Amino acid sequence: MIIRYDFSKMVMDSTMNGLEQNFNDLNCSPVEIMVEHNRDLFGDFKFSVRGNATKMLEEALAYVRMRGLPKVYILIDEYDNFTNQLLTAYKDPLYESVTTGESFLRTFFKAIKAGIGEGSIRTCFCTGVLPVTMDDLTSGYNIAEILTLKPDFTEMLGFNHEEAAEYLRYVIRKYGNNEDRFDELWTLIVNNYDGYRFLPNAHPLFNSTILTYFFKNFAELSGGVPDEMVDENLRTDVNWIRRLTIILENAKEMLDALVIDGELIYSQPDLRSKFNKQKFFDLDFYPVSLYYLGMTTLKDNYVMVLPNLTAQSIYMNYYNELNQISDDARCFVPAYRLFMDHRKLKPLVENYFKEYLGQFPAQVFDKINENFIRCSFYEVLSRYLS
């Protein structure tokens, strides 16, 4: 028997009472659905309390235990979705209230812990973005196992090269009508979607979500390459960077390290599967925080980098936004029209230096290097050329 919760559907509120009400409105139905789907086992069972997700779960689990029914599997998708929203909205006091004491959320997880201990729950599997909320929720929850950094688990987080190549050949055969395009398309997807390493010595993986996004659009276009190389839903909200770094100068310094130096140095002992909110916002911990947000990946035991051209382009967008660099199309389109007519690169280079680099103050040019030129020029080109 399975109970599936999806916390990403949680409606936000600015008060504790409002959040608790929204939590109950969302999470009463999953246990009701489990009971109805297994009515042959639950017989004439009825809930004595409604409108309280924790009490309804406890009642159903008590019945399972008393009648010796099959154990329950609990799945919680995006367990930290709404608590992360509290953090990005600077509602730290409300976050603390939700994740400490006898809050509705801690009480809910205590009910799950009790169910596991008493034998009515076989296991509870949670997915989320950060281990921060789990650390705050499960202090003393000593039966939890964190899979995040286990090698066998990280290998499942994307496609390896063999799997991606097989996937590409299948899509080309079915939708591309020309198997000679393999090398061309392979180079394209490696440059844009490969390069993710979740452990220092791991093999690189393709991001399965955006690779599948590309293939889906490739199929819909009957073998055409989509203009948009990345699903917009995967662009991490720039508010995370603002919230993580607290002040603008910290954000700029961090972005400078990635788009100018091309790397962030990290301490390997910091790469852990569980840490609290205070650690997450610590200045020296930024590289690992970015790793968990999906913004960087591991190059080796000492350095984190942006994994591919897609990530570099997204980061340059962040950089431009935080530095108030205009992307007014009227300043760029004439040069790209000229390029399309005559196929000469010089107008694009001149346009880049005048309209993009020309927006920076003179002192910035002391820091600008080849890596920055390459990343920023590619980002500008990708706006107008597919």
Language-model features: locations:
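P-loop NTPase nucleotide-binding core
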Residues: 1-72
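Conserved beta-strand scaffold positions in the cores of enzyme catalytic domains, especially
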Residues: 2-5, 124, 146-148, 156
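Conserved nucleotide-binding/hydrolysis micro-motifs of P-loop NTPases
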Residues: 8-12, 80-81, 129-136, 218-219, ...
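Substrate-engagement module of ASCE P-loop NTPases
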Residues: 59-68, 94-122
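Conserved P-loop NTPase "ATPase switch" module shared by AAA+ and STAND
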Residues: 68-98
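Structural recognition of the conserved hydrophobic beta-strand(s) that form the central parallel beta-sheet
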Residues: 75-77, 106-107, 121-129
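Amphipathic alpha-helical segments of the small helical/lid subdomains adjacent to P-loop NTPase cores
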Residues: 133-139, 147-216
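Extended alpha-helical interface modules used as scaffolds for assembling large macromolecular complexes
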Residues: 144-145, 204-386
